[in-house]
Amino acid sequence: MATALHILSAKMIHMLLEGRLSPVKYYGLLLLLQLSVSPPAIAVDRPLPEIPICYNYSCNRTAHVRPSAGDWTMVVDQFKPAAGSPVEERQMIQRAIAMLEQIAGEQTPTFRDRGRNPVVNEWPGQMDCIDESTNTARYLELLQQRGLLRWHGVVERAYRAPYILDEHWAGQIVELQTGNHYAVDSWHLDNGEPPYIQAISDWQKKFPFPNE
């Protein structure tokens, strides 16, 4: 088995050097190959996560969210049984992030957060897209670190600026089999609601979200 895997890895490197395989697809296939040999264990005895989040616009305030054992188990359970397709896993990601936002809202003022940037005075806990995308990226990184993602990888935050005064940020994932990127956008919704996930090309053009 190990010899066959080494041969397959060598062929993939050869295809990459010849330009017949893009770097994104190479690393995606390499990760899938590694998972097929030793899938990441979701260890029940690992320490509970401590998640740094921010809020109050442009990450003006920070806090550390510490899920209880019961809360974290509910997050992990969103990925059971394992997703049979990338589409199914994206739905799991939506539910898990919604749950993590709810947990954060129990420990911080972010339970007050409303979709977009409403006009609020003296309203601690409201988040702009910088806060939201930063937190979403951290949630995604946690899910990846704990071995919960099999069809996707986490990459840098997505950014768009179609107009000078219309900058926007979101979390971002890449589908490993295809190399397709998706924005994970929580800013449009109230705290604790499943974020929108949209193909990055559509998100860059501000197309309507698929489930809006």
Mark where each language-model region is.
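N-terminal secretory signal peptides that target proteins for export/translocation
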Residues: 1-23
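N-terminal, post-signal-peptide region of Sec/Tat-exported proteins
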Residues: 70-104
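Hydrophobic/aromatic-rich core segments of domains that either
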Residues: 141-203
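Sec/Tat signal peptide C-region and signal peptidase I cleavage site
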Residues: 39-43
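Short N-terminal segments immediately surrounding and downstream of signal-peptide cleavage
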Residues: 44-61
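Acidic/histidine-rich, surface-exposed loop or edge segments in extracytoplasmic proteins
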Residues: 55, 59-60, 67-84, 113-122
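Bacterial N-terminal signal peptides
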Residues: 27-36
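Mid-length scaffold segments of soluble, non-membrane domains
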Residues: 97-152
